[in-house]
Amino acid sequence: MLRRRDGDGWLVEVAAETRSREYISVAPSLPELRRLVAATTAPDVWLTLVGDLDAESLDAVAALDPVTSGEGMMTTRIVPAEVPASVRIEVDGRVAHARIEVRGELAARGQAAVRAGDVVFDRIETMPSFRRRGLGGLVMTGLSAWSAETGATTGLLMASVSGRRLYESLGWAAVAPLVTFRGGRRDDAPGLGIADLPG
């Protein structure tokens, strides 16, 4: 996964099955937003906007297909901790991949990337048959412990509506709403209105 500055935000080369690349921008100006929308040209090109969207911004993204709504950017202070015994961490440069296996079967996983004093958590997932056992929290604890060892002091993540409760229970705080779009909205697909955005 490669990323680089793009205008006021970032362009991430995701190279995943559903996303080839993703633009990420925090409270872009209207001209910058229009530029980003024009670059979001296909269903595998995504645009994530952090911050509130006003009526003009909603008009600017009307041609795009909403992927998510109600999500939020969250942050926490990273403190030293022990990696739980059940969490296996594999490190590739500045990225750590955590996984928990139960009787040889993948039960939960996640990853985190450190840059300077910040660590970004991503793809935190518990497999359906292993949910409600606290495994997601163990993955987060393991990744936090690893990142503290690297010198990270601030954690960041993009939380889904369903994931927010887990992160809040671990001491994370929401700091801004976010919404993700992809290119190629169908003509009959509903757009995103003010009522669809987090309050």
Residues covered by each model-derived region:
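Conserved catalytic-core motifs of GNAT/GCN5-like acyltransferases
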Residues: 47-51, 66-76, 158, 173-191, ...
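Conserved active-site alpha-helix within GNAT-family acetyltransferase domains
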Residues: 54-65, 137, 149, 161-178, ...
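A short helix-loop-beta-strand connector motif used in the catalytic cores of GNAT acetyltransferases and
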Residues: 1-9, 18-20, 70, 91-98, ...
